[in-house]
Amino acid sequence: MKKKNGDIKKALDKENKIYFIKRLYELIDHGYMLEDSLEFLLIQYEVADDEIKKIKEKLSNGSKLSDILGYLGYSQLIVSKIKFAEDYGRIEDMLVEVETYLKIKKIQLVNNKVFPNRYFYHYY
């Protein structure tokens, strides 16, 4: 039996963060409650049961999705976007926007690794 990942931030690397947001949107969009959606996804990523319990307790104590995403290691920019959406009731729309943003950032990162000096010749 595979050991569950005790470090929640390691379970969600950059690639998994994109997929996590996508699946979270899909579950919420299909009518699942936030807590159930998060628990389902965290189980998929083999996050330790005590970490899942902590997150559920945070939600029960009033934490919002933005707080949980910060706890999961998402950037302050992502957390701020979700916090804004929470204030204006557009969480599903913002999850789609965040997924798109993360995909674009990934493409930019890959392009910079493949073509690190692509702008060099334009200046000389």
Across the structure, where does each feature detected by a protein language model lie?
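Catalytic metal-binding core of the metallo-beta-lactamase
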Residues: 1-118
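Alpha-helical transmembrane segments of integral membrane proteins
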Residues: 118-124
